[in-house]
């Protein structure tokens, strides 16, 4: 009996996602298994709920590690131990079965090889959910579990037909996979959403600044808008001229900071002299509609700056009021 389906089982408490409160939440696992030869292999996994990592499982550890205080969700210790034991059995069996498949397919396929798996469930409003499991071989998406069976994607190589036939013949494992994806995963995620609500709903305001990048060509400038420290992950950043979006804006990948906030930069290449009047605009849920606008050349308007100015003005007013009251008291004492 092949245990590749268990890979999916493992993957259920793991799934990517992006989420906002009262919107869709994605829970997913990414497993990476590398096989240098028949005697050396390793498997590592990470689990995400929305933008937050909730679990990790190193090849060097027998147990799944929690990365959040609420990573067990609402599961009891007994429930969690049962799941963990199943995943331990799965990982051992998966490694063995992949080696058997490679042996069976030789010389068409041989070491080194890499297998990646992603699995989990996406939660929708009203307790609706949708599960998934995808398998990649040597970086190419080749197999999925859909409905009640394993399926080869159209572009997958023909040698996968036999392993998939064997997997689908194992009715007990297929039923277990369905239960884990369609029942256990949504149940576990609901508990995580409740237990991790403060972290999931956290709003961190972005900080933005401008800089000049390396000149892309003679007579041209590269303008760079940096945005950092924001959470949740979704953000909109664009170079503008007045109300006109600049189509040449290039946004890089959104990258994680060490404190679980995010960083993004947006660049714009312009001819020297055409940079006047350009501004970088940042929209984020934490700003509550008060966009950050940074003007190239020094003029800046942002909520943070406004709050600082207001704070300074309040301190000045308080100091003046204190001075006036104190002066009046002294005058009154002199009269007495």
UniProtKB/Swiss-Prot annotation:
PROSITE patterns: IG_LIKE. Keywords: Cell membrane, Disulfide bond, Endoplasmic reticulum, Endosome, Glycoprotein, Immunity, Immunoglobulin domain, Innate immunity, Lysosome, Membrane, Signal, Transmembrane, Transmembrane helix. A motif (Internalization signal) lies at residues 332-335. Its main location: membrane. Residues 326-336 are cytoplasmic. It is found in: Cell membrane; Basolateral cell membrane; Endosome membrane; Lysosome membrane. A D-galactosylceramide binds at residues 97, 170-173. During protein synthesis and maturation, CD1 family members bind endogenous lipids that are replaced by lipid or glycolipid antigens when the proteins are internalized and pass through endosomes, before trafficking back to the cell surface. Heterodimer with B2M (beta-2-microglobulin). Interacts with MHC II and CD74. This is Antigen-presenting glycoprotein CD1d. It comes from Rattus norvegicus (Rat).
